[in-house]
Each structure stands twice: as structure tokens, then as C-alpha cells.
């Protein structure tokens, strides 16, 4: 909200695109959950059809955390899994697949002409890589040791490869030593008005 003398108005958040890092939100903050919804809505409206894919993970709420977007599950090009992932095994497979895709981009597609998603798409306009948003709620619920490793790699390398992790973390549950490396790859969201 911006105010000056008698005038007051709300301005939208400024979000640079593509994202430079994963977006990490506290699990129990309703306003930041709405921010995740608004961010998804902006991505869906800003990118052309076929240029964005969503991976939605919501183990505790069984998909209710992304309720405004459930009708999109029918669009295979948009949500390749066709449903919100809730079980450990399917979460691990999806995160592993994204990690493999990131690895392939870094090793095979990026070179001296293109070192990231934006540059690659700029020089390959006929075959652009889609942007991928991975939305995870309730972390670390149903997140296996292997999934934590995959998620760490996605947070480190995903943003430059056009993969944005949006993660709602229950910080009390990730204080365990086994999450140290993963947590070190993250920067929490700070309400600066700019993401």
C-alpha cells in the first residue's frame, strides 16, 4: 500500500522474470500462500500457452492448497502429471525427473552462446524450453531423503534453467540435521515488495 497525504492505494508487487532463486514461504502464513496463488496466476497469464508446466505437490491438504487451480489438472500440457502429487513415491519421481531435465539442460543445451533458460530461448525461438513452476506445500511432509537431495539441486540450479521452486516450509520440522544442506540452498522470502 502506498500513501501520500489524503491519497492511498495498493500497488502490485514487482516481480522480475525469470526468477533468480527459489521462492520460499513460511507454511502457515495465509497471506504468503495467497502470494503463491497470485504468482501462479501471473505466470499463467504472462506466458504463452504451452510455455509453462506446473508440478503441484500438496501432501497434507490433498490438493486443497492449490484449490483455485484444480480445474487446470485436465490440461495435460499444463500439468503433465494430471493431478496434485500427494504421496512420497510420486513426489520423488517428479522431483527426480525435473532434476534430470535440469542436468540435461546444463550439460547438453547450454553452451558458450546460452548459459541459461532466457538466453537459450532467445537464440532458439522456434523450439523454446517451457518454464516450469514446482509448487510444494507442507515441506518436509512426504519428502524422502532422495527427494530432499533432488529439491536441493532444483533450488540451486533450477532458476537459471527455467524451473522455479515455490516452497512452503514448516520451519519447525526442518530443524533436523538431515535438512541442513537443503536449507542452506534456500533464501527465505522477505516482504520487501520485490521478490
Language model segments and positions:
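P-loop NTPase catalytic phosphate-binding loop
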Residues: 2-115, 124-195
Amino acid at each position: 500500500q502506498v500513501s501520500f497525504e489524503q491519497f492511498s492505494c495498493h500497488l502490485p508487487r514487482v516481480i522480475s522474470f525469470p526468477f533468480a532463486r527459489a521462492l520460499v514461504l513460511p507454511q502457515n502464513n495465509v497471506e504468503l500462500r495467497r502470494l503463491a496463488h497470485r504468482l501462479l496466476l501471473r505466470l499463467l497469464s504472462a506466458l504463452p500457452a504451452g510455455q509453462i508446466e506446473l508440478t503441484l505437490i500438496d501432501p497434507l491438504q490433498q490438493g486443497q492448497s492449490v484449490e483455485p487451480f484444480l480445474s487446470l489438472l485436465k490440461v495435460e500440457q499444463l500439468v503433465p502429471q494430471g493431478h496434485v502429487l500427494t504421496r512420497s513415491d510420486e513426489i520423488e519421481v517428479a522431483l527426480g525427473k525435473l532434476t534430470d531435465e535440469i542436468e540435461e539442460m546444463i550439460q547438453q543445451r547450454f553452451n558458450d552462446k546460452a548459459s541459461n533458460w532466457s538466453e537459450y530461448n532467445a537464440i532458439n525461438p522456434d523450439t523454446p524450453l517451457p518454464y516450469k513452476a514446482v509448487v510444494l506445500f507442507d515441506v518436509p511432509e512426504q519428502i524422502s531423503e532422495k527427494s530432499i537431495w533432488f529439491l536441493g539441486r532444483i533450488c540451486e540450479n533450477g532458476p537459471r534453467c527455467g524451473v522455479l521452486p515455490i516452497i512452503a516450509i514448516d520451519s519447525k520440522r526442518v530443524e533436523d540435521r538431515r535438512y541442513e544442506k537443503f536449507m542452506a540452498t534456500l533464501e527465505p522470502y522477505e516482504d520487501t515488495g520485490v521478490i
